[in-house]
Amino acid sequence: MRETMSRRHFLTTTGIFILVGQAASTVGPSPSWCATAAKVGEPAPDFTAPSTKGTPVGLDAYKGKVVVLEWTNHECPYVRKHYESGNMQALQREATGQGVIWLTLISSAKGEQGFVSAAQADELTTTRKAAPTAVLLDEKGSVGHLYGATNTPHMYVVDKTGMLVYAGAIDDRPTTRRSDVQGANNYVRAALDSVATGQPVKTPVTRAYGCTVKYS
């Protein structure tokens, strides 16, 4: 009897450790370059990256505007959760409808998961009925490193004064289940609401969850 109970305890404990390990792998350790990356409460660093339309887009061009930066990888199951449920598109439309600039960035290196050409990125925007202001291609990962983007999705909010006021996860449900979108605390929406009303962001930093950004 004792042996049976001990075995059950071992299996249960082992299962818990496995589950915890799997959950932890969605965030992972921060790379060394994150130490010098953009920080909440400081001016958002300017950058310029090519859009899928072939024109360079710089953050500086949107002075006086609230800007959302969304790091994405269409093959990542965590990203798919938010697009297949329509959650990301709804948030994009809600934000841009209020004058917010929404820039979607793809930092996957050539040959890595999530890498797409400009035409493929535009096709994804169309088929998923996404509504960003622009999709930017960051093949060399320079913008991603500048902001310390480690996961997809990884979200940032810049206020009208150019300050970085939010960085982290899209919400508090680090799973791939579409059903978990409902009832989740959406940190990005909350940050945008605070900015719109002139209030400080209640939760300015969270730990992003998802697939690691596929840098070269």
List where the protein language model places each region:
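N-terminal secretory signal peptides and thylakoid transit peptides that target proteins
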Residues: 2-19
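C-terminal segment of N-terminal export signals and the immediately downstream linker at the start
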Residues: 25-43, 47-50
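Short active-site neighborhood of thiol/selenol oxidoreductases, capturing the structured segment around
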Residues: 62-80, 192
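Loop/turn elements at helix/coil->beta-strand transitions in domains of secreted/extracellular proteins
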Residues: 64-67, 98-102, 130-133, 160
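Thiol-/selenol-based redox modules, centered on thioredoxin-like
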Residues: 160, 164-216
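Structural microenvironment flanking redox-active thiols in thiol-disulfide oxidoreductases
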Residues: 80-128, 139-145
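Short, internal strand/loop/helix patches
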Residues: 122-159, 164-165
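A short beta-strand-turn-helix
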Residues: 48-67
